């Protein structure tokens, strides 16, 4: 009997922990002028998660533009200077006066299609790969062949110089071959979330005409962001 009661207690604890994990999962709805995207934030990157949520709660992203759009690559937003920018302004250097320490959890978190990642300055100016306080990008990417992924692995191993050579898992290869992404960015930028709804909107944004500096000819704006339950 005591064994039965103990099992019931452990089961109840497991259910409670599972429920708490689900409850803590943070989702953000991004309303844009081209539709709605919903993203899930990763608990594995708490500094980026909490910073993003703070800015969302403060309505920081309201009226911010997608100022850099490259088809088959990514769409970037979050520059506060874009809120009041005219059509000739060069954007992408704005921030909030601080950076976020890198939380690069590669290979667990990688640049698959729909990945949400933090923008940052290049390695020369930023060898620690600290992230922008507010700028982020969403990966559209493209599909890759096994040969192309082999080449990416080779380049990554040149950079990582690990005693155990890196290889993409079968699941990761399948993701990159079937759905796409930007594997050449893996291990270099912090991926802190992913799209769960609105891939069609990502594709709409990626398809807009752009001018010099990859800025859309017609503004694509974030109307609002809101934390949602699921």
Kindly give the residue locations of the regions a language model identified:
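Bacterial N-terminal signal peptides that target proteins for export
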Residues: 1-6
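A periodicity- and composition-biased signal for non-globular, repetitive helical segments
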Residues: 7-9, 82
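Hydrophobic h-region of N-terminal signal peptides that target proteins for export
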Residues: 9-18
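Cyclophilin-like peptidyl-prolyl cis-trans isomerases
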Residues: 17-230
């Amino acid at each position: 009997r005591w064994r039965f009661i103990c099992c019931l207690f452990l089961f109840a604890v497991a259910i409670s922990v599972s429920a708490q994990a689900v409850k803590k999962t943070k989702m953000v709805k991004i309303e844009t002028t081209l539709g709605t995207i919903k993203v899930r934030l990763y608990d594995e990157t708490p500094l980026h998660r909490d910073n993003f949520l703070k800015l969302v709660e403060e309505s920081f992203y309201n009226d911010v533009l997608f100022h850099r759009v490259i088809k088959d690559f990514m769409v970037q937003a979050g520059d506060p200077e874009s809120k009041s920018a005219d059509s000739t302004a060069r954007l992408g250097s704005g921030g909030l006066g601080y950076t976020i320490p890198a939380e690069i959890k590669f290979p667990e978190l990688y640049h698959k299609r729909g990945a949400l990642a933090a923008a940052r300055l290049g390695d020369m100016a930023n060898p620690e790969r600290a992230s922008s306080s507010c700028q982020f990008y969403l990966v559209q990417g493209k599909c890759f062949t096994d040969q192309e992924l082999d080449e990416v692995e080779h380049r990554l191993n040149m950079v990582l110089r690990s005693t155990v050579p890196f290889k993409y898992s079968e699941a990761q290869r399948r993701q990159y071959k079937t759905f796409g992404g930007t594997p050449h960015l893996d291990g270099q930028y912090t991926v802190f979330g992913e799209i769960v709804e609105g891939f069609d909107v990502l594709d709409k944004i990626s398809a807009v005409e752009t001018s010099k500096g990859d800025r859309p000819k017609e503004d694509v704006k974030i109307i609002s962001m809101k934390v949602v339950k699921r």
